[in-house]
Regions:
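Aromatic- and Gly/Pro-enriched, solvent-exposed loop/edge beta-strand patches characteristic
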Residues: 17-144
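A short beta-strand element within beta-rich, extracytoplasmic domains
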Residues: 2-21, 108
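Generic structural microfeature
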Residues: 2-3, 26, 103, 174
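PGST-rich, cysteine-poor low-complexity/disordered linker and tail segments that act as flexible spacers
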Residues: 129-181
Length: 181
């Protein structure tokens, strides 16, 4: 089992159609890896506990196309590829993460963090969604149970996914966030 040494993800900034980044960028991305919580639940596939995290502040980006626009007369939002290489002390070691369950399923979360001292950004970052290879839908997080003495947002190690919803397109096809490890 090879460690995770870097993460690549795709996303857009609401309403942004230029090939360069908008002025109201996140100060960081919170990246987390979660156990699989499905075996302990009778609801749809979903994360369990946060077992690894990092804050990405030195990511690199590239414009990687445009989303389709609802209007033929307007351009679609620009899609950006974000990349974060991890230093060796940040690598996610899969063998060390096993919790005795035998599960080989892990969940990735990436959230944009904005400066709380500034106005809400005009162009908020969102995930690029895509059809899933596995047929399982990605899951949003609506409620996270904080770890003891931890913050609820962003989550800290030991936090637990409590509620959320599966992500589908308008034809009820499962969607997942676009990423590569």
């Amino acid at each position: 089992n090879q460690p995770v040494t870097g993460i690549h993800w795709w996303g857009m900034f609401g309403g942004w159609t230029e090939s360069h980044l908008p002025p109201d960028l996140p100060v960081a991305f919170h990246i987390g890896i979660w156990t699989d919580g499905t075996r302990d639940s009778d609801v749809f596939d979903h994360p369990g506990s946060l077992i690894w995290e990092t804050y990405s502040t030195n990511w690199v980006w590239a414009a990687s196309g445009n989303e389709e626009s609802d209007s033929k007369s307007e351009p679609g939002e620009t899609c950006f590829l974000f990349s974060q290489l991890l230093s060796q002390d940040q690598w996610f070691q899969i063998d060390q993460a096993r919790d005795g369950s035998g599960s080989t399923v892990y969940w990735l979360s990436i959230a944009a963090l904005y400066d709380s001292e500034r106005d809400e950004p005009e162009h908020v970052w969102t995930w690029k969604l895509r059809a899933t290879a596995s047929g399982a839908a990605g899951t949003s997080a609506q409620t996270i149970l904080p770890a003891a003495n931890g913050l609820s947002w962003p989550p800290t190690l030991g936090a637990q996914w409590k509620t959320g919803r599966e992500i589908y397109d308008s034809w009820f096809n499962p969607l997942d966030m676009a990423f590569q490890l």
